[in-house]
Amino acid sequence: MIMIRIWNNYKGKYRFFLSNCRSFSSIKRPQIPESEETSLSITQRRFDPDLAPIKTRVYVSLFHTLFRLYLSCERLYGAARTLSAMCTFGVVPDSRLWNSLIHQFNVNGLVHDQVSLIYSKMIACGVSPDVFALNVLIHSFCKVGRLSFAISLLRNRVISIDTVTYNTVISGLCEHGLADEAYQFLSEMVKMGILPDTVSYNTLIDGFCKVGNFVRAKALVDEISELNLITHTILLSSYYNLHAIEEAYRDMVMSGFDPDVVTFSSIINRLCKGGKVLEGGLLLREMEEMSVYPNHVTYTTLVDSLFKANIYRHALALYSQMVVRGIPVDLVVYTVLMDGLFKAGDLREAEKTFKMLLEDNQVPNVVTYTALVDGLCKAGDLSSAEFIITQMLEKSVIPNVVTYSSMINGYVKKGMLEEAVSLLRKMEDQNVVPNGFTYGTVIDGLFKAGKEEMAIELSKEMRLIGVEENNYILDALVNHLKRIGRIKEVKGLVKDMVSKGVTLDQINYTSLIDVFFKGGDEEAALAWAEEMQERGMPWDVVSYNVLISGMLKFGKVGADWAYKGMREKGIEPDIATFNIMMNSQRKQGDSEGILKLWDKMKSCGIKPSLMSCNIVVGMLCENGKMEEAIHILNQMMLMEIHPNLTTYRIFLDTSSKHKRADAIFKTHETLLSYGIKLSRQVYNTLIATLCKLGMTKKAAMVMGDMEARGFIPDTVTFNSLMHGYFVGSHVRKALSTYSVMMEAGISPNVATYNTIIRGLSDAGLIKEVDKWLSEMKSRGMRPDDFTYNALISGQAKIGNMKGSMTIYCEMIADGLVPKTSTYNVLISEFANVGKMLQARELLKEMGKRGVSPNTSTYCTMISGLCKLCTHPDVEWNKKAMYLAEAKGLLKEMVEEKGYIPCNQTIYWISAAFSKPGMKVDAERFLKECYKKKNARSSNS
């Protein structure tokens, strides 16, 4: 109590601020406002002449006691303030106190920014750092991948370095897959007169094993005069992956070592990190057969890995086994269990686990609280997460960068960008320096929200305070370029980031594979996949899903191959895997394949998602199997999967094929009985379905019912009605509907004007089109690709090729890329009048702009060329050229793209190729076409 009173008496006298002392590096830190809770700052030392030597000794003793008390309670910022207070009273803390604090900050995960800040204050206080402090600082930089800083500190000759210094740098390089670079430090150590020890060699052996270079690892083993248990454990765990465990085990036993629980736990840990969780489980059984019994570390490693691999049942079963066997459950186990339950989506059980650990007299630390905050944020319960952070501060458990980053991630996911940026500033106020992940999350959120300028400013600020660009930032920038369609810039961006020292990780590679597959660059996507494989990056279910999605899209593999390949790699497919494969089968029209995958998914114990159900229902409806589709609906109800708007649309589209209003209304009522609730979206879907068939009277009745039930029609409702009137050629009614909409105070959108422009163009009222286009622009709306497509089609219908091309040029100048259908209209215009040169140029334009031709494009081009070949006025040499071009396009269409020519195109092919010497080629091509056509019709 005396100590606390003395502390409180002098508490008001302390001024804490960030000193302007020269740091050990050239990084300039921003002036951060002081915080009473977390400030680490030091005032200029002042000596009080009135303090007697005896009194000084009392204060020194009290400060030392207070410092140790704070450290024992893990209240590190309190310990830091104590050292600051000592300096204020002219009592310089010795290096042991500084070293203890630096060490604790490092082991508690409060990475390099806080460690380096304490290190700077130590120097400012006039205490020279020793090799221990330097080693901790280097380790903190290695942990976050700032290897260049770590190496520069190693080579700073101001402080004498030792074996531990080199081993720390070697370990950091090996952890980041840079074993070759780490090996070079062995010779440097010898030159410095520092001999490598067993730790040096074991670290390098482990590093080479991790990157798959077992030859170099074995060579290092031969260099060691005496192998220890750790060396054998490293080799054993690495050779397990190569199925050569017998050889490594034999070497270990011959050296006089028996594998113990640590050895097996290390192997299990290595397997789990490599994604081979099931093999880790098998090894758990094997170790028990050898009378080596797992401890809580073994169980915790496996439980954590099973949760991360989404194998929740096995994880919980293993935890139960651990409890039954009487293995004590500590804070780490509780934290892993709680985190895993959050990942499994079991929010209630996760919260119960937290209550259990409190009832078990466990004291939550920053890691436990962070797992709780992260889980709550991912579950969308931000208010509870905010409450937990407040509770942490009340209990003097200071949130770290991971805690705040989790909270910021939660805000960003909810679109609460102002709160995210505000918390980022609060972190700086509390001397918790944001890391690359924190900045990356906010930058990515700003990009997604279209706030590009703010995102770029934040990335500049990040670099200014010394946070290097890293994997998270790279991922945010890559995703931004993907969203805005600037795929070509991605390679340059990656090259630039790698040159700055960013090492691509599994997530980066997965993103790059996804970006290039979606951008249509199959070759680049596969090149990134190959590089990922060569670098020894582990494949998980997410990265494999991206790969098979792209390969299925480009027709490189089948669903069976994808499933088999995944199992061979030891990766268990998840619901997303099955959805990808089923969706691919649906596009190919393989209904049997979809049903096989549906059954296989359920046999694997994977519960279908709503997306899975919609794929199966959609396939059955497309094939006219309504009864079977209803059967799937019944299964959905049993699995407590409720149909959504997509399900509703699938059934309504199918019923509309009969072109009978009673069938559509019957389906509507059926879906309502299965849990679809009436809403504006449901009414709009029903009205749109009726209007597509021109059933505007029925649609108007539905709209009346909609209003009677309290659902106010919106722009979508009126757009559908206008479209229906245009389909039925009721142009005046369509335009009067627009007037009604405006009178009701409902604002038109781009789709409204597109509907009117398309309807008027189809009716041949081109002069009216110009008037509506002007009104659209006067309301500040820019024409989009649909607008231009309608305008070009309208000009084409009246035979105005010049007008069509003028609008096409305007479209390009406006920065829009025409769709395939737009190009088809233009190509058809030129082909119909025999201007194949212009048609050919447009086809080339499609290629340059990344627009893929479809069946209609090829048929138009081939038919046009074949027509010219049969024309009597065309010269023979030009006929030969047209014929060769038609043949090339036909080959590309059938053999490369897998498209089948329509009957009219086949007629013109027959006419053109029926000349002497051409019949054999014609017959071969036509046989192939008919074979493919028959195969496709039989599948459907």
Curated annotation (Swiss-Prot):
Transit peptide endpoints, chain numbering: 1-24
Keywords: Mitochondrion, Repeat, Transit peptide
Cell location: Mitochondrion
Gene Ontology CC: mitochondrion
InterPro entries attached to this UniProt entry: Pentatricopeptide_rpt, TPR-like_helical_dom_sf
Principal location: mitochondrion
Record flagged with keyword Plastid: no
Matching Pfam families: PPR, PPR_1, PPR_2
Superkingdom, natural source: Eukaryota
PPR repeat start-end pairs: 59-93, 94-129, 130-161, 162-196, 197-231, 241-259, 260-294, 295-329, 330-364, 365-399, 400-434, 435-469, 470-504, 505-539, 540-573, 574-608, 609-643, 644-678, 679-713, 714-748, 749-783, 784-818, 819-853, 854-891
Family annotation (PANTHER family): OS03G0856100 PROTEIN, PENTACOTRIPEPTIDE-REPEAT REGION OF PRORP DOMAIN-CONTAINING PROTEIN
Entry's family note: Belongs to the PPR family. P subfamily.
Protein name listed in UniProt: Pentatricopeptide repeat-containing protein At5g14770, mitochondrial
Source taxonomy: Eukaryota, Viridiplantae, Streptophyta, Embryophyta, Tracheophyta
